Design a protein with these regions (language model features):
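Short, surface-exposed basic-aromatic patches at helix termini and helix-loop junctions that form
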Residues: 87, 113-120, 141-144
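Thiol-based oxidoreductase modules, predominantly thioredoxin-like and allied folds used
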Residues: 95-98, 121-135, 146
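Short, well-ordered alpha-helical packing segments
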Residues: 109, 113-116, 147-151
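Local sequence-structure signature of Cys/Sec-based thiol-disulfide redox active-site neighborhoods
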Residues: 87-114
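Non-globular targeting/processing and membrane-anchoring segments
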Residues: 5-7, 11-92, 137-143, 160-213
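Short acidic/polar capping segments at secondary-structure boundaries
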Residues: 130-132, 157, 168
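A short, hydrophobic beta-strand/beta-hairpin element that forms part of a small beta-sheet core
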Residues: 147-162
């Protein structure tokens, strides 16, 4: 298949989970969550966001996302179940592709960070999608460069699981609204507020539990 005129190899989810993470992260810009937040704050102060599109719309999205992340940083709480599971998993690296203007990333990254904080065996690395399209194009969602996209790998670089760009219940809602030609942005963010970060945590429990065996 092609994206923006470039040939892209698309793998099924099953194929991805049988593969090694073959990309070298050396020489790439990796952010911790706190470094990512600081970078976005500095960018907005200077009238910029991440990515090539520096339009007023993208700047506005980024400003709103900073507000969302600030809110989640203060209010998000992990469930007892996800805390217990995360505490028991072996060493993993979580690589998250994102951009500052992405609304779904603002709703989910703070929760991913809180989960990673529970266990020092988890190394969370945040990378910008548009600077790492070679990685992004190996982990498409339904053929698209949807973000955030998390790739979990073990210490032998085997891909353990992928997640993103949003919890499945919200993904299905977005799919339906797109098919009906509706504007899903306001609806999806209301869903996030009502969900209180429960769905993403439940999905991570289901993804991580098999890795404990």
């Amino acid at each position: 298949m092609k994206i923006n005129g470039e040939a892209v190899i698309f793998f099924t989810a099953e194929r991805l989970l049988s593969m090694q993470f073959t990309f070298d992260l050396d020489g790439r810009t990796l952010f911790t969550y706190k470094e990512y937040r600081a970078m976005l704050d500095d960018a907005i102060v200077n009238g910029k966001t991440t990515g090539s599109d520096q339009s007023e719309a993208m700047l506005a999205y980024t400003k709103m996302n900073i507000v969302r992340m600030n809110r989640w940083d203060k209010t998000a709480k992990l469930t007892e179940e996800v805390s217990n599971v995360v505490n028991d998993i072996p060493k993993q690296k979580w690589i998250v592709l994102t951009e500052g203007w992405c609304g779904d990333a603002a709703q989910n990254l703070p929760i991913i960070f809180k989960m990673s904080e529970q266990n020092e065996q988890i190394d969370l690395h945040i990378i910008l999608r548009d600077n790492n399209l070679d990685i992004m194009d190996a982990y498409l969602t339904n053929g698209g460069r949807s973000i955030p996209k998390l790739i979990a790998v073990d210490d032998k670089k085997k891909v353990l699981f992928t997640w993103g760009p949003r919890p499945q219940n919200m993904q299905q809602a977005v799919k339906k609204m797109k098919e009906e030609g509706g504007d899903y942005a306001k609806v999806i963010h209301k869903m996030y507020a009502l969900d209180k970060a429960v769905s993403i945590q439940n999905e991570f429990v289901n993804l991580l539990k098999p890795k404990l065996a």
